């Protein structure tokens, strides 16, 4: 918020982008979706038992493909209004369990989910979802990549990465 104060005092053009959960190719495996994708690829290649080690699968998040995030940032640079705060999100609440099931179906696998106690966070937010209406209305931006396309891209990325392990 300090930057907004400076924008008013110094007449700088500043906007605040509030990013929610981004996912996409090349993301590190310590994030939930790429971590699961890596495990699914390893299962399909016979490098791991058909069990996904995971934290809490019943929380929800607002995931947005990183390519849509980049487009949102460009839209803000071109059309965003000075001093405004924008949520960069899909506006769709996704349960982690559902995304894992979708990825397993894409991969053609049946897997067991194993809750790994070391991956649980005691102060985990149960639900996270944003509203990107202001961003859409003021810049004309809208997400262009479906969650299914994103999950397919993440799985394809991990296919190549596991080959190099």
Question: Positions of the model-derived regions?
Answer:
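Active-site Tyr-X1-5-Lys
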Residues: 1-15, 37-44
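Short, conserved clusters of charged catalytic residues that mark active-site
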Residues: 1, 18, 130
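C-terminal substrate-binding subdomain of Rossmann-fold SDR/epimerase-dehydratase oxidoreductases
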Residues: 32-165
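Flexible, glycine-rich beta-alpha linker
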Residues: 15-35, 60
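Active-site "gating" loop of Rossmann-like NAD(P)-dependent oxidoreductase/epimerase domains
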Residues: 7-9, 27, 48-51
